Amino acid sequence: VQADASGQVRCCRKVILPLAFVILSSLAIAHSSRAEAVPSSTPHSLKGHWSFQPVRRPTVPDVSRLTPHALRNPIDAFVASELAKQGLSAVPEADRQTLIRRLSFDLIGLPPEPEEVEQFIADLKSDAYETLVERFLASPHYGERWARHWLDVAGFAESSMFIGDAVRPGFWRYRDYVIRAFNADKPYNQFVTEQLAGDELFDWRSAHTFTPEQIDTLAATGFLRCPPDATDNQLITQFEKVYATQQAAMEVSMKALMGLTMNCVRCHSHKYDPISQDEYYKLIAIFQPAYDPENWLAGIWSAGNPGPIRAIPVLDRPGREEYERRTRNWQAERHNLNEQINGGLLRSWRDRHMKARAEEIRDDAARAKLMSLLSKASAERTPDDEKFIDSQVEALGATQTALEKAYPGFAGALAAARTRIEAIRKENANLPPLIWATFDVSTNPSPARLLHRGDYEQPAHSVEPGVLRALGPSGDPFHVAKVPHSRTSGGRLALARWLTNREHPLTARVMVNRLWQYHFGMGLVATPDDFGERGARPTHPELLDWLAAEFMDNGWSIKHIHRLILNSATWRQTSFIAATVRREADANLASDDTTAAHASTGAAAAGFPSRRLEAEAIRDALLEVAGLLDRQLFGESLPTQRLPDGRTDISTNSTTRLRRSIYISTRRTTVPTLLTAFDAPSMDTNWPKRNDSVIPQQALALMNSSFALECSEHFARRVLREGGPIFEKRLGRAFALAYARQPEPDEVALFKKFGESHGNAAISSGGDKPLTLESWTAICHALLSSNEFLYVD
């Protein structure tokens, strides 16, 4: 443990090693250094890799003689061309009930109302489907659905993960920013710029008050705060964790925006892609003013972090200045009081007590060691010293409880310190709203240095801000321009402009691939976060480039790409033979893993791929069908709690517990059990593509969870209320709500028998002996537990 010039305690990892190990390590390092000094030709040869070439709009193929089906837009032409190479063709369009259910879940994440289905089926106008697409795109719930996808890409969570998984109050503002951005169809280049450098777009420090738009722009930089942060709750500043947090902010953002994995480049130049270790640290240098290891801001207040934090209060300028002064003072006081309680007071009284009773230790060596350690000043003791002293506490009755009883002076001092801490807490209980943002901490940051083997204790030469040479547009080098009249470096703003340059080869390709993936279940590139040499090849390379060019040429409009995909004949195909086609294609074409991914994705275009709803959509659909869903938009997250049986659920005390799942507090270690059963991630990192498992726990969760049973009962009450007195009408209403269709005759007969077995009553078509609520609850429970409810065709 060391102290720097400012007196801040820092932890180092240096240990004394045996001489032989030191010698062997030195030889290994010397050998590896010589090996790394020889430049590899591999990265240079890969500058011709497909994804590193500028996007050029390809010619739409003429496939009029290759397919009997109508082509609705260029997407269909590209897909038909690839299918023809595999001896396949597109399949017919799905029926209207299937299309509206598919479209509703795709765009807003909820099942359609039966009245919406009936209206769409009855609409004979030629543009009925296109009108439906526009209506769903205009829904405020569209932003909730598609924000959830982006939050996966960003790795959004409202806690730190480490050391108690400390909560980040107010971080929900970033989530709300993303929802609003999707609803407004904010141009993607602007969306990227605000998330990387929203704080550099205006002089927020000088602003007298913040407009709602400015609050959103600052909240957007929460994108860089999404990765886990081990520095949020440290008692001492551990440089290893500081650097890890800084590196994660850069790595996750570049993976999300450029689709390149860069973790390995911390330690050495990329073995496959044209990314040098020097370039990695040039990117780090762009983030250095905001994430400066020598001038670190904690993410939250804690006993270990008493000073200012990485957050901006939503107050006018005088209020912000007063808030900073006041919080700095009371945090420092609280920190000192905690130190007194946990360190000074407790340790001094403990040491006094143990010295007085040390003779009770029978082991002579242990007694001598204890007396020697107690004679040291506490500041001179090592962690191992304190660990040994603590091991004797119980035996000598030096616990805090025992000390309070034995020494009234200690108890009084302890009570006074605790009383003052509680008074501070009450004085500051009503903190102003906070924006958990990213911003430059200093106008003169410490120099960024290349770290040998990624070790912060082995800094090499300093590096200037820069980007990847293999991706830079020719004739337009990366340049950081100082923002006039601003206390910001302008580095992240320059990075955003480099990424959104029309000639950048990756940004548009990566995003349109993500959009395709969320519409079809698999991207045109099966590895959405790895467009490098080791990633998958695009199944439809010309289609990918055409979409990327179309994206940029139409103002980076995400909804424009939605319209193209959703209105295509490719997306509107039926799905009943898709699985068979994919199996045949895999058997014929897949000779290795890469080809298998290519075959599956290509064949998926010969029929829509049936797939299971995500965890959040399942929960939301259960609430919607039951008539329980609270559709309130935006605001604070729903708290979760750990139950005595080990499960995690939304707090039963929450008055808004029936809101959509995107509003559930995303603590990394306490994801609701129902959601984890259906593959909701814990966000230990970002999740560009979720797992899609089929496990027994999923069926058990729907059969036995109190939430599913509650929804089933409310669903049954809704059916009884809206379905009329006749069994067939009620069952029809239940099917319409759950499946967006009417039951077949054999299904009516099956559920009649099922209902009678639960209600012990025969059912007449006239409704003379209607089933009980218990029977209808069982019927509704069966519908909600079925594959047809969980899957979209």
Roles of regions detected by a PLM:
Residues 35-61, 148, 159, 184, ...:
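Post-cleavage N-terminal segment of exported redox proteins
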Residues 1-13:
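N-terminal secretory signal peptides that target proteins for export/translocation
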Residues 64-101, 106, 110-141, 156-209, ...:
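Primarily short, surface-exposed interaction patches in extracytoplasmic proteins
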Residues 779:
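Globin-like tetrapyrrole-binding proteins
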Residues 16-28:
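Bacterial N-terminal signal peptides
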Residues 346-370:
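Extended alpha-helical coiled-coil "stalk/arm" regions
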Residues 201, 208-328, 332, 675:
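Sequence context surrounding c-type heme c attachment/ligation sites in exported
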